[in-house]
Amino acid sequence: MFLSFDVIGDLTFGEGFGQLESGVKNRSVNDFVSLGFVGGLRSMFPTISWLSLYLPIPVFRDATKIQYRTFDYAQGALDRHAKRVEELGSDPQPTVFSKLYTAGAEDVWTPIEIRDNAQVFIVGGSDTTANSMIYLIWAVCKIPDVRRKLLKELEGLREDFGYDELREMPYLNCIVNETLRLFTALPCGLPRIVPAGGADLAGHFIPAGATVTTQAYSLHRDEHAFPDPYRFYPDRWENTTQEMKDCTMPFGGGSRTCLGRHLARIELRLITARFFKSFPNATVSELEGMCDKDMEPALHFLMVPSGHRCLINLEG
C-alpha cells in the first residue's frame, strides 16, 4: 500500500507521500482507504451523498468529513507542485498535471474540478493496485506449482532488470490476468444512466433514464468462460478464448475505462518480479493466527481482505 501511494503521488504531483520512508499509515492514507467503504454506497445509492450533509447519522457524518479531508490532501499536493514549478521556473519532471497544464486544462477546468480530479487520481491509483498486489503475492505463495513456474520464468532476469524485459513474460502476465479476474480491485457495479430514446440490451428494451450496471465480480466468475471459476489458475490464460475476453473487465470498459489501467499492470508486473526474485522461498505465514479466512474478500466499493492483513514468511 505504501508503495502504490508513493508511486501515484510521484507520477501525479512530482512527489511521493513519504509512506515508504515513514512506514506508518498516517491519517491521510487511512482516509483514502476509508473512501473504499463508502464508495460502494455512493455508487449504488447516490442520494446518500446528498443526505449525508443533513442527517446526523455517525457513519454518514464521518464519511462526509473524510471526503472533505481527502479534497484538502489533494489540494495540498497541487499547491506544493505549483510552488515547485514557480520556484524552479519549470516542472523538474513530467507529471500528470504538468501535462494537463501544458494542454491548457486550467483554462477549461475550474480550480474545484482540478482538485476533484487530483483526488480521484490518488484514490484510483493507490489502494486499488495495492489490494490486487496483496492478493497476487498471497495466491502465488500459497500455491507451490504456480510459484515454481513463475520462478523458472524469472531465472533469466538480470538483477537490475527493467520493465521492457517483463512485457513478454507469458506466465507472469497469466498471473497478473488471473489476479485481476479473481481479485479485481473494483468488484461492484458501475452504474450508467440510459440516454434519451432508451436502449436495446441483450434482447430487452431499457427505457431512458433507467440505471443499468455491470458487475465485474459476477462476470469474472462465469463458469462458461472460466471453468472452476473460484480456483486461482493462471494457466487458463495460456489459451485465451473470446468468451474469456468478453467476460473480463477489471478496469471497466468502453470510453469510461480506467485511465490508469496500463500503470496498474506495469506496477503489478514490476513488483511481482522484484518480490519473487528477492524472496523466492516466500510462503504464507501462520503467525498470529493468520489463515485463509483473513483473505476472504470484503466487498465494498473496492475488494479488500476481510482480515485487513496478509502475513508472509519471506524466508519460507
Give the location of each predicted region.
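Cytochrome P450 heme-thiolate monooxygenase catalytic core
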Residues: 1-133
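Short amphipathic alpha-helical face segments that pack within enzyme cores
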Residues: 3-7, 131-135, 263-274
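Hydrophobic, repeat-rich solenoid/adaptor surfaces of innate immune receptors and signaling proteins
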Residues: 12, 133-137, 216, 268, ...
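Cytochrome P450 I-helix active-site segment
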Residues: 24-34, 90-96, 139-186, 202, ...
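Cytochrome P450 heme-binding "Cys pocket" and the immediately downstream C-terminal segment
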Residues: 144-146, 243-244, 261-301, 305
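Conserved cytochrome P450 K-helix/beta-meander segment immediately N-terminal to the heme-binding cysteine loop
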Residues: 195, 214-241
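C-terminal helix/juxtamembrane-tail motif
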Residues: 300-316
